[in-house]
């Protein structure tokens, strides 16, 4: 997919997400709808899309769209735990080359994980996790736009989202 088309799709997605979260307070409903909207926007790129949130010093599974997922991930383990531990977005072109990758699905070939940071402190509240069945699916444009989405979600569901 070319960058111009990808950017346009993300811009439309971001506007849809803003509309979905406006005046809503049901955290589970918001996140379920956002994950579905994300997957529908990129049906050929996103095999699995969902959220993990920091609770009891581990990442715990939140709403998602896709196959059965790992329920808990330790800090520093796999792509999600590493993104949380390092408080940075990770783009993994080939998950089999990522040391310590947790294979929740054998179909996953590439992955991007984006921290959802508390507004102000920057503390990681959770992560957006997206997997693809193709190698090298994600790039810096995905990272940039998904970080915008993470910011919207942090402002919308706030710190209390740890208590889904």
Predicted regions and their residues:
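Residue-level recognition of short loop/turn positions
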Residues: 86, 120-121
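Juxtadomain coupling helices with adjacent low-complexity linkers
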Residues: 2, 18, 132-164
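A short, aliphatic-rich beta-strand micro-motif
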Residues: 110-119
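Short coil/turn motifs at secondary-structure junctions
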Residues: 56, 119, 133-135
């Amino acid at each position: 997919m070319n960058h111009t088309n990808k950017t346009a799709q993300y811009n439309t997605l971001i506007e849809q997400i803003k509309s979905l979260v406006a005046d809503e307070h049901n955290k589970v409903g918001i996140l379920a709808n956002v994950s579905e909207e994300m997957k529908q926007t990129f049906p050929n790129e996103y095999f699995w899309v969902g959220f993990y949130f920091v609770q009891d010093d581990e990442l715990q599974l939140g709403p998602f769209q896709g196959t059965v997922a790992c329920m808990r991930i330790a800090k520093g383990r796999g792509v999600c735990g590493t993104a949380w531990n390092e408080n940075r977005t990770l783009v993994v072109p080939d998950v089999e080359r990522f040391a310590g990758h947790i294979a929740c699905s054998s179909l996953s070939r590439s992955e991007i994980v984006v921290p959802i940071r508390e507004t102000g402190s920057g503390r990681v509240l959770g992560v957006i996790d997206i997997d693809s069945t193709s190698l090298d699916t994600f790039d810096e444009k995905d990272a940039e736009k998904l970080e915008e989405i993470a910011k919207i979600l942090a402002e919308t569901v706030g710190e209390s989202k740890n208590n889904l």
